Every structure is written in C-alpha cells, then in structure tokens.
A protein has these predicted regions:
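Glycine-rich FAD pyrophosphate-binding loop
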Residues: 20-44
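N-terminal Rossmann-like FAD-binding beta1-loop-alpha1 element of flavoenzymes
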Residues: 2-28
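Short, flexible helix/strand-to-coil boundary loops that buttress conserved ligand/catalytic motifs
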Residues: 39, 43, 60, 158
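Short polybasic/polar patches that bind polyanions
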Residues: 20, 68, 147
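Dinucleotide-binding Rossmann-like beta1-alpha1 core, especially the glycine-rich loop
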Residues: 45-132
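A secondary-structure boundary/capping signal
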Residues: 6-9, 31, 52, 59, ...
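Active-site/ligand-binding neighborhood in enzyme catalytic cores
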Residues: 121-219
C-alpha cells in the first residue's frame, strides 16, 4: 500500500517513519525547501543554534521513544548551561529563581526582578486576592495568565518561555490541550500561584529527573 503524507514537519516525518517501519511505501510532500517544519538548527560561529524549539518535555514518553527508535535515545541530555534570560528593552534580564513554566512562585521576589516594572509586579500580586481562579472552558494560556497575573508576566515571562517550548504564540495556545501540566496545576479556587504551589507539593515526581531533554547537536 502506498501512502502520501503532506507536510514534512515533526508530525509528518514521525508518521512517515512509523509507516515505513510497518512496511508501507510512503511519499512525503513538502512545499518548502527543507524538512523539519518549526524545528530548525543552524550553525552560527561554530555553535549549533535552535531557531525553533530547543528541547522537548519528558512528561509524555512519545518523543523519547521516537528518539530511541531513531537510534539517538542514549545521546539525549537535559539542557544545561547559564540560566535562561529574557531580552527586554535592550537588556538581558533574569527569570525568577522559582517559577513554573514562567509563572513566578514567589511573588515577593518580583520586587527585586528587573524584568518587571513596579506596576507589573503590583499587578501580579493581585492574583492572591482576585476571585475566580479556575480556567474557563477553552481558555488559552495567554488569557489565564493575563487575567490572573497581568500583561507583563505574560509578555515577559510566560510568553517567551512557552514560545520557546512550543514554537508558537502562547496567547493562541489552548491551556488544556497545549499545556496540560499548567491546566492541571491551575485548578485551585483561589490564586493561580497558590494553586500551582499546592499542585507541586502533591507531585511524586523525582525532583532530580529532567523536565526537558534535547540532543547535543540540536533538535
């Protein structure tokens, strides 16, 4: 049986590989001049730079299983190096020391964080008193974060971090299907930050286990 797959991003390439492994003849069609879709690694000044997503989440086994099927599973490593920073207004700024996918877990720390303005830090702290924390049906990541913590936390913390993970705009990313771990952590009745704190306390996950994995040569 011959099968045609349209689009050679990660989904198309993975489907083609699985079908070939099952004995099917596969034709892969791609409109652009390269394969990989959102995933693109370029060499700049001797360094491999990921222009799209630079790692994958380990909470689901599919990506790790695919890497082992491709023969590179033993080469996977957690991203390491200098702490992540965000470029805002012509300067590099540190992320909070404690955060969950960009959501700050210590709101008092925001007063000393150069990434946010004084007004942005004050707005974020309103999360502790605002009612109606639970996500609404079909709500996006951007909608929840802006509603609970304000625009600056979204634009300068959560947006850049999740944009790097998902290679897309977090304002358009469905919370429940796109970032299920944040959706599950935000089910408390009051305060998104406290809800996440309680969620993390109840997790049995090994804290030493990496949240992300990547390949040394880039995705």
């Amino acid at each position: 049986m011959n099968i045609t797959i349209v689009g050679a991003g990660i989904a198309g390439l993975s489907a083609a590989f699985e079908l070939q492994q099952s004995g099917f003849e596969v034709m892969l069609l791609e409109d652009s001049d390269r394969l990989g879709g959102k995933i693109l690694t370029s060499e700049i000044e001797g360094f491999n730079i990921d222009a799209g997503p630079d790692s994958f989440l380990t909470r689901d086994p599919e990506m790790r299983e695919l890497c082992f099927s491709l023969g590179v599973g033993d080469e996977l490593v957690p991203p390491t190096g200098k702490p992540a920073k965000v470029w805002v207004d012509g300067e590099m700024h540190n992320l909070p020391k404690r955060h969950f996918l960009g959501v700050p877990l210590d709101l008092e720390e925001l007063d000393e964080l150069s990434l946010l303005t004084e007004e942005g830090a004050k707005r974020a702290k309103l999360d502790l008193t605002l009612p109606d924390n639970k996500p609404k049906e079909g709500e996006t990541v951007g909608s929840l974060i802006r509603r609970r913590l304000g625009d600056e936390v979204m634009d300068r913390l959560v947006g850049p971090l999740l944009g790097g993970i998902n290679a897309g705009d977090a304002d358009d990313l469905c919370l429940e299907s796109g970032v299920p771990q944040l959706f599950n952590a935000s089910q408390g009745d009051f305060s998104l930050v406290r809800s996440i704190q309680d969620f993390l306390k109840n997790q049995n996950r090994d804290p030493a286990s990496p949240v992300f994995l990547t390949h040394p040569d880039g995705l």
